[in-house]
Amino acid sequence: MINILREPDDIKIECEEDNKDCTVETEIKDEKLYVYISAAVARPRFICLRWNYRVTEPTRIMGDKWERSYGDMEWHSLNGEIFMPWYFLANSGDKTVGCGVMTGAGSFVSFQCDASGCTAWFDVRCGGTGVRLNGRRLLAGVIVCREYSGISAFAAAKAFCRVMCENPRLPEKPVYGSNNWYYAYGKSSRAEVIRDAEITAELSAGNKNRPFTVIDDGWSVNPCAGPWKPNEKFGDMAEIAAEFKKIGVKPGIWIRPLCDKELEKLHPEWCLSRINDGDTNNEPSYCLDPTVPEVREYVRSA
């Protein structure tokens, strides 16, 4: 079965310009493969690690998604064109192997698997361009790999997810409720979200752990891009939150704290530009840089 907990057979680096002073190092310790990258002048964008082996038995693969699944995660045959974010599972009937990266990685990590081996991509870009390490050594990620037998693939997946996340941040109680994006898609109003709260409260009657009613995009004056001020269809959001509590649900709201269109001109030094720098579908062409102290203070106080 698949095992990438060893030194890779090939390492490639992609930088903005020259990569002559860029170095990738790997270290195996405590059943983990540590991947480091350092550079003085070069601005690395991607690290590519490749492990060569032959898959000789029938194998099904399932990978994760970057943020969440929309019902599209599945077991499929080996396909080297599919990128699998964070981790993947390989099942050969009586055995399941999990390969992935520990949570809290210093990059966005994805995997590709084919019959001849496995490739891991470490996206270390900052704001869409190569990261300026200025001599620093960055821990891009920590790879782990486990093999399970005698249990179902689902049980193996749960066990492997515990391996990848040693210190999970779990809520004291289950989080559940409603989110109006999945039927309104940004076209809603104060009256409609109040009705959402009433329906959610009715469906959860008798539960001591009360549900959330989340108001998604469509409540602000400039959807998607900020500033995060209520539009005329919603009015005072604090009043709506208070009404939710009276109804018997916990108020929730959707927001992009690192997007505020007004700040693009007021504080351009706070912003990171996107590669395409386009304003399609009202999406902002920038985002606030959370490494800037003033940005963090603004988000806390806004």
Predicted regions and their residues:
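Acidic/aromatic-lined carbohydrate-recognition and catalytic surfaces
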Residues: 220-268
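Carbohydrate-recognition beta-sandwich/jelly-roll modules
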Residues: 1-211
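The substrate-binding groove and active-site-proximal loops of carbohydrate-active enzymes
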Residues: 175-193, 219-235, 281-300
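A general structural detector for well-ordered alpha-helical segments in enzyme core domains, enriched
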Residues: 196, 200, 236-240, 302
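Active-site-adjacent "subsite" loops/lids of carbohydrate-active enzymes
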Residues: 182, 250-302
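Mature catalytic domains of secreted/periplasmic carbohydrate-active enzymes
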Residues: 126-127, 208-211, 221-222, 226-230, ...
